[in-house]
Amino acid sequence: MNPLIWALLITKHLPPSIITMTSHHWLLAWLGLELNTLSILPIIMKTHHPRATEAATKYFIIQTFAAALILFASTINAWQTGHWSITASSTTQTTTIMTIALMLKLGAAPAHLWYPEILQGVTMNTALAITTWQKIAPTTLLLLLHNHLPTTLLVLMGLTSALIGGFTGLSQTQTRKIMAFSSIAHTGWLLMTLMLAPHLTTLTLITYILMTIATFTSLSTTTMKTITDTNTTWTNSPTLLTLTMLSLMSLGGLPPLTGFMPKLLVLNDLVIKNLTPVAVTLALASLPSLFFYIRLAYLTMLTNPPNNTNTKYNWRFKPLPHQTTTTTMTLTLLLLPTTPLLYLTT
């Protein structure tokens, strides 16, 4: 692809989300969501592979259907209330439809079946964009609507996402599918923060984005597409592979890594508000994710000695981590000591 066209596609990918995040009118928000979908489709299809074409088609259908639901609900709401403002009062029916549509855009369970398949059909960098930047605009709309969201629906979808993201990831061997189910599990925690403490939603989202960027850039640098690829990655760059495993455990929420910070704050708020059963369920739901991360780290670092392998892989290649990997990896591993400061400011 022509570098100028590629630069244009990347640049065009940024304004739609900004339009949605800064809008107070439902039509502008819907326009930003649609442009956001259309801007990433050429990036998905860049590899000219049948899997990429299939992923782009699925992504277009799902996102367009969700945007149509949002437009339908906002039109009905404007007809009944006489305004198009996002933060103003809405009817229960339209708010429920909007919530379901935004859950579909986020890939939250039970509307999650499209999410792992699409990530499996794209490149690592495209999967990174789908799991991070594409989540910002729908999350912003949910944050603007948090006073009107149906609490029961949010709790059910949050717990379901955390459970399905953890237990379904146990049987996966593809790293992109593992990251997909990790994203679904983190979406469940994000929904719980929307219901309980909206001021923690931004912190949870930023922490998730930092950990995901660090993990995806590390996987892309080491060219790890399956768990079996770790057998040769260890001989390439032991340090980078160790940091990758630590970032995966941070995604699982293992203390004393950064991923434990938002989970600690969410569980603390749940206990303070006398929702101990929900807190226990969320904590137990995070254990399967942590289990397959630790299992992956154990199989990689403790059972594979650093010896030369007689395989077709280019094991003599020594990948150099990108500057983005170094920065985000540092934040992924070392931000937990700032938790007391967050207690003082929230």
Which residues fall in each region the model found?
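Core, highly hydrophobic multi-pass alpha-helical transmembrane subunits of bioenergetic inner membranes
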Residues: M1-T346
